[in-house]
A protein has these predicted regions:
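Short, solvent-exposed amphipathic alpha-helices that sit
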Residues: 73-88, 160-163, 187-206, 244, ...
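N-terminal helix-turn-helix DNA-binding module of bacterial transcription factors
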Residues: 1-60
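Short beta->alpha junction loops
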Residues: 95-102, 207-217
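Short beta-strand segments enriched in small/hydrophobic residues
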Residues: 18-21, 55-71, 175-182
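An alpha-beta-alpha
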Residues: 164-203, 299-312
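Flexible loop/turn connectors
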Residues: 225-233, 238-312
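Alpha-helical recognition/docking segments in bacterial nutrient-uptake
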Residues: 3-4, 61-166, 170, 224-229
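Hydrophobic alpha-helical segments within soluble ligand-binding/sensing domains
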Residues: 153-178, 217-224, 242, 279-297
């Protein structure tokens, strides 16, 4: 016999409305109650009646996608693959921006609950706490940042920097400057910065690290500081910062080899000495949808996948 919300409520000794709120990720439900009800739902493999979806006017599943910035070259590559995979499954995307603001994520979550979306793909960032993220546990995948017991797709930041540094070192460079991101950013900033410094230390070459915000303008403004020391090559934490470096070098009639994480077709057209690394952005998008569909299919998972990197 097919289980109903009433059956779940009886087994948990709560009201039907409480079960409904858990299914809709209502933040007003206490953590203890949510976990108790979710445990019964997972154990019994309960799935809500799909007729409820039709009553709300949605013939197809809806997935909310929260990117940090729609103008991000990196995230747009991941988003493009996410959309391709969702369209293939007849799933409707609802795309919003967080702009690195936890408050906006909370507002978007409220919107998703109002729209009764089926699942969420969230591009994480350092300021976003686990407390906020776990509101959608059970129908959520994070991208770029991993959280405990939450399905996630994350990047191999440390190995990416180490791979590029190794290649530049093999080419004979010993004064490799690094245009990085503020350490408060755990992935693009902290992890990549630490990897650069560790390589310099292990290979006994001088470190020249300058931090910028993750924008072209900020990177450009930090370039004079980076160039105060001898530089034979410049490694950048992102393709946008590589554009900053290229702009500065061209304006000052300097020609130095550049390297960066990620691929930017326009940048590659103008930077002849560019070494890039395929960070696996499309693969991340494909895997994110896979993990979300697993959950929407009624299965519980906390799988976290690290995307491999490859020199272009």
């Amino acid at each position: 016999m097919k289980l109903t919300i009433k059956d779940i409520a009886a087994r948990c000794n709560v009201g039907k409305s409480t079960v409904s709120r858990v299914l809709n990720n209502d933040p007003k439900v206490s953590v203890q109650t949510r976990e108790r009800v979710q445990a019964v739902i997972d154990k019994l493999g309960f799935q809500p009646n799909q007729s409820a979806r039709a009553m709300r006017g949605a013939s197809s599943p809806v997935v909310g996608i929260i990117v940090t910035r729609l103008n991000s070259t990196a995230e747009s590559q991941t988003l493009s693959m996410i959309l391709q995979q969702l369209y293939a499954q007849n799933i409707i995307p609802l795309i919003v921006e967080s702009q690195f603001q936890p408050e906006l994520v909370i507002r978007h979550f409220a919107l998703f609950r109002q729209r009764r979306v089926d699942g969420v793909i969230l591009f994480g960032f350092s300021q976003l706490s686990l407390e906020i993220v776990q509101q959608w546990r059970g129908s959520l995948v994070t991208v770029a940042r991993a959280y405990p017991n939450i399905p996630a797709i994350y990047y191999d930041d440390e190995n990416a920097i180490r791979t590029l540094m190794t290649k530049l070192y093999q080419q004979g460079h010993r004064n490799i400057a690094y245009l990085g991101v503020n350490d408060q950013d755990e992935t693009t900033g902290h992890d990549r910065n630490r990897s650069y410094l560790a390589f310099c230390n292990s290979h006994q070459i001088p470190a020249n690290l300058v931090e910028a915000e993750l924008t072209i303008e900020s990177g450009y403004l930090q370039m004079p500081k980076l160039m105060r020391k001898p530089v034979s090559a410049i490694l950048c934490a992102s393709s946008s910062l590589a554009i900053s470096a290229l702009k500065y070098l061209q304006e000052n009639q300097q020609n130095l080899p550049l390297a960066c994480i990620g691929q930017n077709v326009l940048l590659q057209c103008f930077a002849t000495n560019l070494l890039t690394l395929d960070f696996g952005y499309p693969q991340a998008g494909k895997w994110a949808v896979e993990l979300l569909l697993t959950q929407l299919g009624g299965k519980t998972t906390t799988e976290q996948r690290k995307v491999p990197v490859n020199l272009s």
